[in-house]
Structure formats: structure tokens, C-alpha cells
């Protein structure tokens, strides 16, 4: 929106051409999202408290979590507001990828909103039924996958890139691309949601991964940088740098209120949306495997649930004291803040490994 205004003004005042630089707009998107979070956050928290939009806590969870009952939830709406406004202000709105990620993010956010609303209104910690949730997630995920495949303008947009191997590129047909994209988007969405169980646990890894994806998006959308680093060139992908920067700013702003002891929880409206956003960006910039590496904490949390459920159904025994994984460590005696910070450190290490794939080929 502001980019178009700047381009119009640049016809008479050349200084406005500076807004054509993606890097500048990414910085401004971060600051804008951060500012919106700081300004809107306290008001939103007061409203959520006033309307008693409080978190329901599972009876079978760690006993230390019982004090969290009643803490305002659905704070993910704050994140989405900041991301959307910031992106609309600073991104190139003629870029199709910008609209793909915005629509996907908001679509999953709506699913999360309904899920949270049912938890609040009906006082049911399980919220929306699993079948209904996965149906709508699948519908959006498959739709986005089909759109991206059929609107691809260069072969690189539908190729699977294997990190650390310079020339290992796997062309994907329609079915394989759509299936892979579906699992990346839906899988990441649910993985972030599973991780969002402790104060600040999910949001900081999300910020770190989004920041790294911003780098990949910038490189993938830059003809010369992509060629130099051996990254597939995806025309238009650079604008996703602005979107990822908005996620980073909104996430840090939310962390201000979500840090232990949390004043507000993001709820499914935030977790499902953020996971879908990360997955969609990774697909567009062709870094699905790198996302798997950088989002290792999300992966571990998801696998722990799958192993726990599978083991209990097959043998009647549990592998972990409780799943997802963060609860296992809580029951082992780790303090909540220890689990959170240690998972942050792990994510930081994995993000650095992911970024190293830009050069180590």
C-alpha cells in the first residue's frame, strides 16, 4: 500500500525510490508489527479478561499448570492483526505470493479462532473436533498446494531442493508437489500448535525460523544472489522477506505479554496460523527440508505425540511421562522456564545449521 504511494511520489521526489528496497521495507515491517503489538496488546488483554475469554486447563496435565486456568487466551489475534496490517502497509500488493501467504495464514487463523471459541464458550479443553479441524486444514492446504503448482512460472517453483548437495534437485509432478506441500503446511501448523504449551515456548522459535526464512526468501527472489549461492531463483519470492519480518516483529511484540508468567496465551488462532505461515513460505522458497531442520523443536514435539499414542495403542505403555515433549521434561523436574529457554537454545542452533546450507553445498 505505502509502496505504491512511494512509487507515485518518486516521480517527483527521487528520494522515495528508497522504498523499492526490500530490506528497508522488511525493517519497517518489523518495527510496525512490533509497535502495533505494544499498542494493541494491553487493550486486547483487558477486553479478553473483561469477556472472560480464559484458558481451560486439562485435568491430566502437570499440576503446576492449574494456576494458568483463566489466563486470557486467543491472544494470537494480536499477532495476526500486527502481521496483516504491517504486510499490507509495506509489501508489494501486486505480488501473488504475498496474497497466498496472507490468505493461508488468515484461513488457518479462522480455524483456530473457532477452536478457541468452542473451548471458551463450552469450557471444553478439546475445542473443535479433530475431524472438523483436519478437514478444514486439509481443504485450505490442498487448495494452496494446487494453486502454487498450477501458477508456477519457472521449473524451480516445483522442484525439491536437497540441502548440502549443490546439484541434487528432484523435479516434482502435480501429485507429488501437492502432497508434499499439503503435508508441509498442515504438518507445520499442527506442530507449532502442539509446541504452544508453555509460556513463550512456541513464539520465540517461530520468530527465529521466520527470520531465517526471510533470508531464504530474499536470496531466492534475487537473481544474482540466488545464482551465487546455488539457491533456486523464484521470481517474486523476495517480497516474502517483508511478510517474514512482520512475523518476527509481531512475535516479539507478543512475547512481551506471553513471557513467563504469561498475561495472555496465543491459543490455536495464533499457533495454527503461524505454523501455516511458516510452512507456506518454506514451500514457496523451496526450503521444505531446511524448515524441517530449523523447526526441529516443532518436529520433536510432534514425533513425541505420535510415538506416545502409537506405543500406548500397541503395547499399553507410554514412552514419555507425558506428551508433548515439553510436559515430559516438566514431569522430570525441569522448571517451566528451563524447558522454554533450553528449547529456544536448541532452535537457535538448528536455525544456524539451516542458514549454513546457503553456503555449505
Swiss-Prot record:
Origin: domain of life: Bacteria
Catalyzed reactions per annotation: UDP-N-acetyl-alpha-D-muramoyl-L-alanyl-gamma-D-glutamyl-meso-2,6-diaminopimeloyl-D-alanyl-D-alanine + di-trans,octa-cis-undecaprenyl phosphate = di-trans,octa-cis-undecaprenyl diphospho-N-acetyl-alpha-D-muramoyl-L-alanyl-D-glutamyl-meso-2,6-diaminopimeloyl-D-alanyl-D-alanine + UMP
Cellular localization per UniProt: Cell inner membrane
Cross-referenced PROSITE patterns: MRAY_1, MRAY_2
Transmembrane segments: 21-41, 73-93, 97-117, 134-154, 168-188, 200-220, 237-257, 264-284, 289-309, 338-358
One MF term in the entry's GO annotations: phospho-N-acetylmuramoyl-pentapeptide-transferase activity
EC number: 2.7.8.13
CDD domains given in the database record: GT_MraY
Biological pathway: Cell wall biogenesis; peptidoglycan biosynthesis
InterPro entries named in the record: Glycosyl_transferase_4 (IPR000715), PNAcMuramoyl-5peptid_Trfase (IPR003524), PNAcMuramoyl-5peptid_Trfase_CS (IPR018480)
Keywords: Cell cycle, Cell division, Cell inner membrane, Cell membrane, Cell shape, Cell wall biogenesis/degradation, Magnesium, Membrane, Metal-binding, Peptidoglycan synthesis, Transferase, Transmembrane, Transmembrane helix
Chain's role: Catalyzes the initial step of the lipid cycle reactions in the biosynthesis of the cell wall peptidoglycan: transfers peptidoglycan precursor phospho-MurNAc-pentapeptide from UDP-MurNAc-pentapeptide onto the lipid carrier undecaprenyl phosphate, yielding undecaprenyl-pyrophosphoryl-MurNAc-pentapeptide, known as lipid I.
Entry's family note: Belongs to the glycosyltransferase 4 family. MraY subfamily.
Name of the protein in its database record: Phospho-N-acetylmuramoyl-pentapeptide-transferase
Gene: mraY
Amino acid at each position: 500500500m505505502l509502496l505504491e504511494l512511494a512509487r507515485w511520489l518518486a516521480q517527483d521526489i527521487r528520494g522515495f525510490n528508497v522504498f523499492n528496497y526490500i530490506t528497508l521495507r522488511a525493517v519497517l515491517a518489523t518495527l510496525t508489527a512490533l509497535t502495533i503489538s505494544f499498542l494493541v496488546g494491553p487493550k486486547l488483554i483487558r477486553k479478553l479478561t473483561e469477556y472472560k475469554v480464559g484458558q481451560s486447563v486439562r485435568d491430566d496435565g502437570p499440576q503446576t499448570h492449574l494456576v494458568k486456568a483463566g489466563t486470557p487466551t486467543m491472544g494470537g489475534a494480536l499477532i495476526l492483526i500486527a502481521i496483516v496490517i504491517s504486510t499490507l502497509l509495506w509489501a508489494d500488493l501486486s505480488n501473488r505470493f504475498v496474497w497466498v501467504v496472507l490468505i493461508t495464514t488468515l484461513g488457518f487463523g479462522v480455524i483456530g479462532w473457532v477452536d478457541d471459541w468452542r473451548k471458551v464458550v463450552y469450557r471444553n479443553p478439546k475445542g473443535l473436533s479433530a475431524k472438523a479441524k483436519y478437514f478444514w486444514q486439509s481443504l485450505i492446504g490442498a487448495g494452496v498446494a494446487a494453486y502454487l503448482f498450477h501458477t508456477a512460472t519457472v521449473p524451480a517453483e516445483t522442484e525439491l531442493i536437497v540441502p548440502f548437495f549443490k546439484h541434487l534437485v528432484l523435479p516434482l509432478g502435480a501429485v507429488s508437489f501437492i502432497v508434499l506441500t499439503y503435508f508441509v503446511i498442515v504438518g507445520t501448523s499442527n506442530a507449532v500448535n502442539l509446541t504452544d504449551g508453555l509460556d513463550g515456548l512456541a513464539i520465540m522459535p517461530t520468530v527465529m525460523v521466520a527470520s531465517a526464512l526471510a533470508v531464504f526468501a530474499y536470496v531466492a527472489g534475487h537473481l544474482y544472489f540466488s545464482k551465487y549461492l546455488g539457491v533456486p531463483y523464484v521470481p517474486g519470492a523476495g517480497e516474502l522477506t517483508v511478510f517474514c519480518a512482520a512475523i518476527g516483529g509481531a512475535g516479539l511484540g507478543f512475547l512481551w505479554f506471553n513471557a513467563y508468567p504469561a498475561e495472555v496465551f496465543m491459543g490455536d488462532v495464533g499457533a495454527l496460523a503461524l505454523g501455516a505461515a511458516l510452512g507456506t513460505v518454506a514451500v514457496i522458497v523451496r526450503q521444505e527440508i531446511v524448515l524441517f531442520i530449523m523447526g526441529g523443536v516443532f518436529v520433536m514435539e510432534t514425533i513425541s505425540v505420535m510415538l506416545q499414542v502409537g506405543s500406548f495403542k500397541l503395547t499399553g505403555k507410554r514412552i514419555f511421562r507425558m506428551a508433548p515433549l515439553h510436559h515430559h521434561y516438566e514431569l522430570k523436574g525441569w522448571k517451566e522456564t528451563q524447558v522454554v529457554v533450553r528449547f529456544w537454545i536448541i532452535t537457535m542452533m538448528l536455525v544456524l545449521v539451516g542458514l549454513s546450507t546457503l553456503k555449505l553445498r
